[in-house]
């Protein structure tokens, strides 16, 4: 995973490395040249870029917490949940009381999903060391075998942990709404409409998606 890195402290877990994809500047240059909306959006956000904390368990756990809620709501619940364990590690999560997890704002279903995720990591059921060499669809197939992880969550993982450059998460409500607002004056948008718009984004669909998200919510999306 090629990336430029800087150290950032985390109040709950040990210091992690924040990383931005090395391809970001190249992608932005391409998108500004190929797409009228990107030409308008990208300069609005200056040097801001996608960042990953580089931890696969945290990335997937945050994706589960963020399912079907706004970016702001997801951040609030995550902060409450992340304050519970001594460290955000699978073994620590498995020691938490269900009532405490529910009190943090997690639904019963999301609690089940997070526990199952932690068990998959602790049990060595995931090919974590092989992910960097696997293609997108192979990784998605492995991840969707975990309860609570569907294609959307797997695609968030590809974007935010592995920083794959050309992921188009068509199940993402924010992406569809953003395409509607930015390209179709707010009119309803189908998946085929979204695919057609994204033709100009290739091979940098992940980057364009990130800017579409930012156009809807000033709070950067992070997992």
Region locations from a protein language model:
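Non-catalytic interaction surface on structured domains
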Residues: 44, 52, 56, 103, ...
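A positional/architectural concept
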Residues: 26, 32-63, 68-79, 83-86
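A general alpha-helix detector
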Residues: 59-64, 96-100, 138-142, 174, ...
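Alpha-helix C-capping/helix-to-loop hinge sites
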Residues: 48, 63, 67-68, 84, ...
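Alpha-helical ds-nucleic-acid-binding substructure associated with the helix-hairpin-helix region
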Residues: 18, 37, 41, 69-70, ...
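Structural motif
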Residues: 50-58, 105-109, 198-205
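C-terminal accessory module of base-excision DNA glycosylases/AP lyases that mediates lesion recognition
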Residues: 1-48, 132, 136-137, 151-223
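Short alpha-helical scaffolding segments that buttress acidic/His motifs in well-ordered protein cores
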Residues: 60-65, 114-118, 157, 208-212
């Amino acid at each position: 995973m090629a990336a430029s890195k800087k150290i950032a402290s985390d109040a709950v877990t040990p210091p992690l490395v924040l990383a931005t994809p090395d391809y970001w500047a190249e992608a932005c240059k391409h998108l500004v040249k190929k797409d009228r909306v990107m030409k308008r959006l990208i300069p609005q956000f200056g040097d801001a870029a996608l960042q990953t904390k580089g931890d696969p368990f945290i990335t997937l756990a945050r994706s589960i917490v963020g399912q079907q809620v706004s970016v702001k709501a997801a951040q609030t619940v995550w902060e409450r949940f992340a304050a519970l364990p001594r460290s955000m590690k699978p073994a620590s999560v498995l020691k938490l009381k269900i009532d405490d997890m529910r009190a943090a704002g997690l639904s019963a279903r999301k609690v089940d999903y997070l526990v199952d995720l932690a068990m998959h990591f602790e049990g060595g059921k995931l090919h974590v060391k092989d992910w960097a060499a696997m293609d997108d669809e192979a990784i998605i197939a492995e991840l969707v075998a975990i309860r609570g992880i569907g294609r959307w969550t797997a695609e968030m993982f590809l974007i935010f942990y592995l920083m794959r450059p050309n992921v188009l998460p068509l199940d993402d409500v924010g992406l569809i709404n953003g395409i509607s607002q930015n390209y179709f004056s707010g009119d309803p948008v189908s998946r085929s409409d979204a695919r057609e718009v994204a033709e100009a984004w290739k091979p940098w669909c992940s980057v364009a998606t990130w800017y579409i998200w930012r156009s809807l919510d000033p709070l950067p999306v992070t997992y």
